């Protein structure tokens, strides 16, 4: 974890408690964090070290050890990192082991259930939907997914063998930044530069804390004031990652067109597009514009991995190259 900690990096809301009803003004917390200086000192790995870590993790996944070791508390790094964030930044009460983590995750998940339609009428409303205190559950969920290597497909060479050394990579709508996390652990010998971009939500705050001092990373927070121009002057990416994002966007066609325009010719475009019911945090406009968005993508890329033949169904993990 980054060395940046402190309760001043978390702006509390009134009410609740510091255990199973912690209430955070997450946008103000992001703005407070963005004012902090960065001391970029994280060391990057070497190839041989990354090689051994990668193959050990691959073997652990294949043998079914990853999940059991994490769930039983034998693999503890993920839990210690989360606990440091929970205690030293969010000011939560001490977690006594992995059982406390799961008990709390269950409590926050119950609060997070959406039983009524959400208001998507403006950028401000869009952000507020993701910033409700109950959405703290998403940090628990993403931390656990990271620990269990649920996105274990990220360990496969089909992605990283295609990424050039010294690439500039955008992980858009990154949440806890699973692609950067994988790169940091296993592929940092590629010496890439990263831009992690998302709205000021709960998992992205944890991602910033984790990677604040990493020299390979820049953070791009999409507030209401830059909602219509989310990338600013950032351009010339070698890789753009848009995973588990499109179904949540209010303007998926605009965002996709923007991202493709900032991707170099020959660059990699990694994406998927779930066909959801447009409930909860899945945006109704994104469901209505699926075919138009997918047609835009297909018209500008060559699909290297994945299947986009059935536009009426969910589109799974795809790797494409911009034409």
Predicted segments, located by residue:
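Conserved N-terminal segment of class I S-adenosyl-L-methionine
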Residues: 2-235, 256, 271-320
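A conserved beta-strand element that flanks and buttresses the S-adenosyl-L-methionine
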Residues: 241
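Hydrophobic adenine-recognition pocket in adenosine-nucleotide-binding enzymes
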Residues: 245
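Di-metal (Zn2+ and/or Mg2+/Mn2+) metal-binding site signature of metallo-dependent hydrolases
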Residues: 248, 252
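A short glycine-rich, Lys/Arg-flanked "PGG" loop and its adjoining helix->strand segment in the class I
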Residues: 254-268
């Amino acid at each position: 974890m980054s060395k940046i900690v402190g309760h001043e990096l978390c702006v509390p809301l009134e009410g609740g408690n510091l255990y199973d009803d912690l209430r955070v003004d997450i946008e103000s917390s992001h703005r407070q964090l963005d004012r902090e200086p960065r001391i970029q000192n994280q060391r990057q790995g070497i190839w041989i070290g990354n090689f051994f870590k990668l193959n050990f993790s691959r073997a652990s996944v294949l043998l079914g050890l990853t999940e059991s070791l994490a769930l039983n508390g034998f693999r503890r790094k993920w839990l210690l990192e989360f606990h440091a964030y929970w205690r030293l930044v969010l000011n939560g009460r001490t977690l006594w082991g992995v059982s406390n983590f799961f008990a709390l995750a269950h409590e926050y998940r119950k609060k997070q259930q959406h039983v009524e339609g959400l208001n998507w009428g403006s950028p401000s409303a869009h952000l507020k939907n993701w910033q409700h205190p109950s959405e703290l559950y998403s940090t628990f969920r993403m931390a656990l997914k990271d620990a269990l290597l649920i996105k274990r497909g990220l360990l496969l060479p089909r992605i990283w063998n295609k990424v050039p050394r010294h690439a500039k990579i955008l992980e858009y709508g990154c949440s806890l930044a699973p692609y950067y996390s994988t790169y940091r652990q296993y592929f940092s010998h590629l010496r890439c530069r990263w831009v992690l971009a998302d709205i000021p939500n709960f998992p992205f705050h944890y991602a910033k804390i984790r990677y604040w001092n990493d020299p390979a990373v820049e953070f791009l927070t999409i507030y209401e004031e830059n909602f219509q121009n989310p990338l600013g002057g950032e351009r010339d990416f070698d890789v753009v990652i848009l995973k588990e994002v499109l179904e949540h966007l209010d303007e998926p066609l605009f965002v996709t067109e923007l991202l493709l325009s900032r991707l170099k010719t020959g660059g990699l475009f990694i994406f998927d597009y779930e066909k959801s019911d447009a409930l909860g945090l899945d945006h109704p406009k994104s469901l209505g514009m699926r075919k138009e968005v997918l047609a835009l993508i297909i018209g500008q890329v060559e699909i290297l991995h994945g299947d986009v033949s059935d536009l009426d169904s969910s589109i799974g993990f795809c790797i494409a190259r911009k034409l």
